[in-house]
């Protein structure tokens, strides 16, 4: 009895500091964001005026905010689908096929993940340069270009950011899936071969179901982190330009804060928070399956 109480006390003492810090630095600031979204406050004035839902009503009429949300959703969906498709395919190839230098390819694919967003943005900004960028130079070898392609112009800026984000993320998830695929017993594939199942059938009927728990976990994590990564790439590569064409919700929130619209920027933050929470819940619901064991 005494040992049981001592154990509970020990667990409480271990958990309490982390819980207190989480409450102070996560819960309280989040609640304060919700509170500030209901007020109007100037940049240099400590006075706050309660406006209720006025900031949220303004959001519905703000075309630039709607555009930034559309950009964010486009980036989240596109980057997630492309990254996970390539990560799974590359992981399957490097795990199942007898390719020399597997560790070398792991390192090569993983390197972009350890680079900072600023470095990656600098690399791709140099590649996308209209005058002497690598991409336009390569295209110029095959056809004459009277006017250089503006990869960071209004029409192509979002696809250009998508490419940079996919390049940065793909290696990390490939390595994670390789670890999961390596744990799948070879005997399952051998039995499938005897039954006449091809590699594609084995991939969808054996590999994917058996590593689905890992896919589901990483998918939820990646979708939420992409919302933040999209902001970092936009901030580093374009600062929301040109003419707000690459603005995402977070970058637009910061621009409103810099303009002194604190309450309005907090309202944008609340919308992003609720969107992230709802998206996570939807992903968990849609990807929920019975766990298969081997």
Residues covered by each model-derived region:
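A structural signal for multi-pass alpha-helical bundles of membrane permease subunits
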Residues: 2-294
């Amino acid at each position: 009895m005494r040992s049981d109480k001592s154990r509970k006390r020990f667990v409480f003492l271990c958990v309490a500091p982390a819980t207190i810090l989480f409450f102070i630095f996560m819960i309280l600031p989040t609640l304060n964001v919700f509170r500030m979204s209901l007020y109007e406050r100037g940049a240099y004035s400590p006075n706050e005026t309660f406006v209720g839902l006025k900031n949220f009503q303004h959001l519905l009429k703000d075309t630039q905010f709607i555009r930034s949300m559309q950009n964010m959703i486009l980036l989240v969906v596109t980057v997630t689908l492309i990254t996970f498709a390539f990560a799974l395919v590359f992981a399957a190839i490097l795990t199942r096929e007898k390719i020399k230098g597997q560790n070398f390819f792991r390192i090569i694919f993983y390197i972009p993940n350890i680079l900072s967003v600023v470095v990656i943005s600098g690399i791709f900004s140099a590649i996308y340069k209209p005058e002497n960028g690598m991409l336009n130079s390569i295209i110029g070898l095959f056809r004459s270009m009277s006017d250089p392609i503006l990869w960071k112009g209004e029409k192509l800026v979002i696809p250009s950011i998508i490419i940079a984000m996919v390049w940065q993320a793909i290696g990390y998830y490939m390595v994670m899936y390789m670890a999961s695929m390596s744990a799948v017993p070879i005997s399952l594939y051998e039995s499938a071969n005897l039954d006449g199942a091809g590699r594609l059938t084995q991939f969808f009927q054996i590999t994917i179901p058996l590593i689905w728990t890992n896919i589901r976990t990483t998918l939820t994590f990646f979708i939420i982190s992409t919302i933040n990564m999209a902001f970092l790439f936009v901030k580093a590569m374009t600062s929301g330009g040109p003419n707000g064409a690459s603005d995402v919700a977070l970058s637009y929130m910061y621009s409103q804060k810099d303009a002194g619209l604190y309450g309005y920027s907090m309202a944008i933050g609340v919308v992003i928070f609720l969107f992230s929470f709802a998206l996570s819940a939807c992903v968990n619901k849609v990807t929920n399956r019975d766990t298969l064991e081997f």
